[in-house]
Amino acid sequence: DLNFDNIDMQNRMIDAMEYWVKEHDIDGYRADAAHSCPPGFWKKSIDRLKKIKNVLMLAESDVYHPGGSELIELFDMSYNWSGHHELNKIAKKENNLFDLYGNINRNIKDYNSGHILMNFTSNHDENTWAGTVFDRYGDGVKTFAALTYFLPGMPLIYNGQEYGSKTRLEFFEKDSIEKKNKEYFEFYKKLSEIRKENKALHISKEIEFEILDISTKNTTFLKRTFDGDDIYFI
């Protein structure tokens, strides 16, 4: 374990992060298990980095992990773990859309309006340990993927999803991703085009997110609005 009481160690770690921004103009950092480092360290790091460039800081954590809001609000974006687990439960028919509505409302309440949640159906942990999206979502793969574009926040496409990969990639091993399944490439391309072309799907504090119909557990009717632009998810 690192001793974060050692200020010299903290400064050397921040120096290393500054190096890649100054010398290689990288756009930001993903902080793996961000809650394993004290919020004070991240505040110091992010303050110094943003004096160089407005880097994007992504925390692999959420407000329900250690550090809570104090930690997460230091970052521009964090993982929507609670939303992801909700999608998994719905796919397994353990939960329903009422539970998803509850999760959306909790997130709106628990995160400040300027924070970005990263929505996902897969990532390196889930793919390796819990299974591919086809293992977990079955025939609903595309529906749940589209939902990550519609929920408040930013969608994540994990390695291989754009080619419909059914491989559980191993940590620290070389795995090749076959770039053959154009169906999923075109699917994600279309989702991204829809997101780019519709202002209601952009990230903004002024986005209005509305649940229009909660009369059934199995059909959802959602609406996003911004600057006169409306988009619906059914």
Model-derived features: where do they sit?
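Short, acidic/polar
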Residues: 5-23, 139-145
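Active-site-proximal helices and loops of the catalytic beta/alpha 8
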Residues: 22, 32-117, 147, 164-190, ...
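Substrate-binding cleft of secreted/luminal carbohydrate-active enzymes
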Residues: 145-166
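The substrate-binding groove and active-site-proximal loops of carbohydrate-active enzymes
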Residues: 1-10, 27-36, 84-94, 126-137, ...
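Carbohydrate-binding surface patches
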Residues: 211-234
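Conserved, mostly hydrophobic/aromatic
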Residues: 13, 20, 31, 57, ...
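Amphipathic alpha-helical
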Residues: 184-205
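Loop/turn elements at helix/coil->beta-strand transitions in domains of secreted/extracellular proteins
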Residues: 26-27, 52-55, 153-154
